[in-house]
Amino acid sequence: MTQQTFLVEIGTEELPPKALRSLAQAFADNFRTELDNAGLAHGDIEWFAAPRRLALKVAALNAAQPDREIEKRGPAIAQAFDAEGKPTKAAEGWARGCGISVDQAERLSTDKGEWLLYRALQKGQRAQDLLPALVASALSRLPIPKLMRWGDSDTQFVRPVHTVTLLLGSESIPATILGVPSDRVIRGHRFMGEAEFTLDSADQYPQILLERGKVIADYDARKALIKRDAEAAAARIGGVADLSDSLLEEVTSLVEWPVVLTARFEEKFLAVPAEALVYTMKGDQKYFPVYDAAGKLLPNFIFVANIDSKDAQQIIAGNEKVVRPRLADAEFFFKTDRKQRLEDNLPRLESVLFQQQLGSLRDKTDRITALAGWIAQQIGADVNMATRAGLLSKCDLMTNMVFEFTDTQGVMGMHYARHDGEAEEVAVALNEQYMPRFAGDALPTSLVACAVAIADKMDTLAGIFGIGQHPKGDKDPFALRRAALGVLRIVVEKKLPLDLLTLTQEAVRLYGDKLGNASVVDDVVEFMLGRFRAWYQEEGHAVDTIQAVLARRPTRPADFDARVRAVSHFRTLPEAATLAAANKRVSNILAKSGDVLAEQVQAVLLKEPAEIRLAANLITLQEKLAPLFADGRYQEALVELATLRQPVDDFFEQVMVMADDEQVRINRLTLLNKLRDLFLQVADISVLQ
């Protein structure tokens, strides 16, 4: 069958830069699904994305669907003809539906009888007849949170559409997509190259756009070019560019023809904390900061122009002029804020609401202070430093710098605390209280910082759950999932001796009578245990491994972690599957027995050699396991328990558990209960599949 290259390009106004890659990839994924569902065989699908276009190029697309034989079974012969051999109404109706007469139908004979049969060869539809609808369907399923209308049309898309190009080989496919008739015309760069030009064939794309339109349509090629040139530009001035992937992606999505340039700002601004300067360079201006080999900020920045200008110096001067007032603002705020101590902002926190039912930021600060001190005591941190850091934790929110540059909260508290002569551990804790800010982020470095970070997050969790505003579905306005996972990560990875139950109880107690939800403690603990499930699944642990541990509901995160890792290791042992099945069998037997079990196994009632051996093994193991359980050495404990495989197998093969003699039966059930209880010291392995 003939194969050709297919191209679709949707020319738009500037697309949202932070969504450009995801839109293009979703377009490709959706269209691949459409082609596969339509039975159109194809080769690789390349996606292209630039600020004003989304495009797909499909290699080796079949010219048509394959022909296929269709069969439609009709009525049974007994129902298809009457006593005189004439077709019944059922047979005639079926034949009409197939477009034939009854006498044209074939007959299908099977061991169950004979039926009328219609058999025909259905020719596959041409690709050009199918493609417009497939493109439209793929576009309609893009992940667009907000759609736009433009002109007087009811058509909606992420941005207004100006051109649509559909080419199959050299043939232009007529269609109207998103209200725009298709054509061969595509648009080039706004200020360089040709404004519009015609494509002769799909294979010319994207090279013709590069040569005549001065647009690099290949997203990853554009990104690689920016990265390479920015690294080289930084090296030329003896520095290293901060090319964070998120900003690199955003800049890639803003330019069609990237030109990397280097600019400067006055060295006097380096007296301002680097975080504030970087915030305005990266956040407001989309510039890449430059650091020296020691990690110190240089008075330079790298930016990406969207035009290859004859007068690059003018563009550089323009960008330097734009950033200067922002840096001057930061300098002014920094000087002004330091005219008073950080602690002087405490009274002003009373005028800022944390949450209507939960009081002001000052109220929250007082709770954090008390809770941080309590946590510090539990984990062996300096209580005085933890309470001091808790007291100052929100003071920087009232500074000019943080008001203007919101992402500098915490870090500016650290700088102002240092200026005031606070202890270094207190100052660092003010910055690290927000850690981890996102998945994979660093954790607080000191125990004091850990205490404040946990206190802040637990106060929010207790308060919001206490007024019944817990996350619902995808909505989590107070970022409670992130807060819960942050607490768990800190406690687990820092191996802190904290219990979620007592921690939550203390956080709730500090609210006094403000919380109306009577089950708030249980709700918060259950929510946090649920976060464990998500966390360990992402780490690659099996769902039933996590469920086995959750069945025991251990509320000490470090202990929970040890159990999960122990069960994951246990699963790799050759004895695991048999012992998991045995535990399931034991659980079922005990659930159905209805007998009241004894506290201890009575040796005099043990009759069979297999039950005597199992009982002896349990006694020996109990002595070995007691210190392992006490120290949380669950992996070693499960390895020891794995030695029970043969005694357990022998027991079930040779012993009748539900004996007629009541005392013997109860003794055997008690023995099995002792066996199960040993495993339950770690997890309920009966749930393992």
Swiss-Prot record:
Cysteines engaged in disulfide bonds, as pairs: none
GO BP term, example: glycyl-tRNA aminoacylation
Documented EC number(s): 6.1.1.14
Subcellular location per the Swiss-Prot or TrEMBL entry: Cytoplasm
Keywords annotated in UniProt: Aminoacyl-tRNA synthetase, ATP-binding, Cytoplasm, Ligase, Nucleotide-binding, Protein biosynthesis
Reactions this protein catalyses: tRNA(Gly) + glycine + ATP = glycyl-tRNA(Gly) + AMP + diphosphate
InterPro entries: DALR_anticod-bd (IPR008909), Gly-tRNA-synth_bsu (IPR015944), Gly-tRNA-synth_heterodimer (IPR006194)
GO molecular function, a single term: ATP binding
Pfam families: DALR_1 (PF05746), tRNA_synt_2f (PF02092)
A single GO cellular-component term on record: cytosol
SUPFAM superfamilies, per database record: HD-domain/PDEase-like
Sequence similarity: Belongs to the class-II aminoacyl-tRNA synthetase family.
Quaternary organization: Tetramer of two alpha and two beta subunits.
Protein name (Swiss-Prot/TrEMBL): Glycine--tRNA ligase beta subunit
Gene field: glyS
